[in-house]
């Protein structure tokens, strides 16, 4: 069996055996595979913007945006498209090649879709890859986003099926898999990963990666998050994960999903430069860039560029910018907003009722 073979039939015992390798052997295997598929000194940079913050009805025990927990987070309405475009332009100027937009929803409502599809069109017109994370998607919603040109859709599995019920009770594991299936069927690329350091066992980290690697097609991007403990959430006092276990998770993800981008996501703000360097060597080749990830802290842009310089890394170049499309899209946007505003007489209707599931 080739070291570089793409497989979808991983046994959990095989993955656990990879986790158990001596660190030097694991890193050597992961880095060898990484060099086969990617330039090891190139890192894809994404910017993540919260386009609708707080008041989420879900009970994810790690999340400060849940309406069920008192975290001091102020809820915000869906951002105007012009504000999103301003942030997207800033992201591109700072070196990002992908712009991700996240909304704290269980799922978008149909009346939200015109706004969302216009956001996608306008951001793409700037020459950025686009990604959204909006919660669960129906088949029709997936098709609308794909039709607008959305490149990636993020929907994480979070953890293993076995540990999932200890983290979330308001959304089933199968519903997450169904959303990924809808996204893939629509033609969009899938971004899906999980969170480690939530009190799970090593077998749960193996189980999460098994679920991702055994999808019919591997996710195009696999974000691996280190839990950011937020006061007011049920997981605020959970024990820290050994940082080397995080590195092992990155390395195993690279080995069993050799063609996927593996992203260092939440938690980087508290990671040392040395730890991040190990993660890049282990196969991580994507980061979120900017001082905030939705509502949690992230390293400053200057810090990231300084680290890149010290490590000899360089940002991946994004697609060419069809800037001439922007004026046309902005005209369309103004007409769309005028039409859609008639459907939203009350500002509070732009939120989900946190008490209604």
UniProtKB/Swiss-Prot annotation:
Key word 4Fe-4S present: yes
Keyword S-adenosyl-L-methionine: yes
Pathway(s) this gene product operates in, as recorded in its UniProt entry: Cofactor biosynthesis; biotin biosynthesis; biotin from 7,8-diaminononanoate: step 2/2
Residue numbers binding [4Fe-4S] cluster: 56, 60, 63
GO biological process annotation, one example: biotin biosynthetic process
Cofactor(s) the record lists: [4Fe-4S] cluster; [2Fe-2S] cluster
Reactions catalysed according to its record: (4R,5S)-dethiobiotin + (sulfur carrier)-SH + 2 reduced [2Fe-2S]-[ferredoxin] + 2 S-adenosyl-L-methionine = (sulfur carrier)-H + biotin + 2 5'-deoxyadenosine + 2 L-methionine + 2 oxidized [2Fe-2S]-[ferredoxin]
Cofactor comment: Binds 1 [4Fe-4S] cluster. The cluster is coordinated with 3 cysteines and an exchangeable S-adenosyl-L-methionine.
Domain of life: Bacteria
One Pfam family hit: BATS
Residues reported to bind [2Fe-2S] cluster: 100, 131, 191, 263
Protein name: Biotin synthase
The species this protein was found in: Shewanella denitrificans (strain OS217 / ATCC BAA-1090 / DSM 15013)
């Amino acid at each position: 069996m080739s070291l570089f073979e793409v497989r979808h039939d991983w046994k959990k015992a095989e993955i656990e055996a990879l986790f158990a390798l001596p660190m030097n052997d694991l890193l050597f295997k992961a880095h060898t595979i990484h060099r086969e598929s990617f330039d090891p000194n190139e890192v894809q940079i994404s910017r993540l913007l919260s386009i609708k913050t707080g008041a989420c009805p879900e009970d994810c025990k790690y999340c400060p945006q849940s309406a069920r927990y008192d975290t001091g987070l102020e809820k915000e309405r869906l951002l105007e498209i012009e504000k999103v475009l301003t942030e997207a332009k800033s992201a591109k100027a700072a070196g990002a090649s992908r712009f991700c937009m996240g909304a704290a929803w269980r799922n978008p409502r149909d009346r939200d879709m015109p706004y969302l599809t216009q956001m996608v069109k306008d951001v793409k017109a700037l020459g950025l890859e686009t990604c959204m994370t909006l919660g669960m998607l129906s088949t029709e919603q997936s098709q609308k986003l794909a039709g607008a040109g959305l490149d990636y859709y993020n929907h994480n599995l979070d953890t293993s099926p076995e540990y999932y019920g200890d983290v979330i009770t308001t959304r089933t594991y199968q519903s997450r898999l169904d959303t990924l299936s809808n996204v893939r069927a629509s033609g969009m690329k899938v971004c899906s990963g999980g969170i480690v350091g939530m009190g799970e066992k090593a077998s749960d980290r193996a189980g999460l990666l098994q679920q991702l690697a055994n999808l019919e097609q591997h996710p195009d991007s696999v974000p691996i998050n280190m839990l950011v403990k937020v006061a007011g959430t049920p997981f605020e006092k959970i024990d820290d994960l050994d940082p080397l276990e995080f590195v092992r998770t990155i390395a195993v993800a690279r080995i069993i999903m050799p063609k996927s981008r593996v992203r260092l996501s939440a938690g980087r703000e508290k990671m040392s430069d040395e730890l991040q360097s190990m993660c890049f060597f282990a196969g991580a080749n994507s980061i979120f860039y900017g001082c905030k990830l939705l509502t949690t802290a992230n390293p400053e842009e200057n810090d990231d560029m300084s680290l890149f310089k010290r490590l000899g890394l360089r940002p991946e170049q994004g697609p060419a910018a069809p800037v001439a499309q922007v004026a046309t899209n902005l005209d369309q946007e103004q007409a769309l907003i005028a039409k859609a505003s008639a459907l939203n007489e009350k500002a509070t209707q732009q939120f989900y009722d946190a008490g209604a599931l």
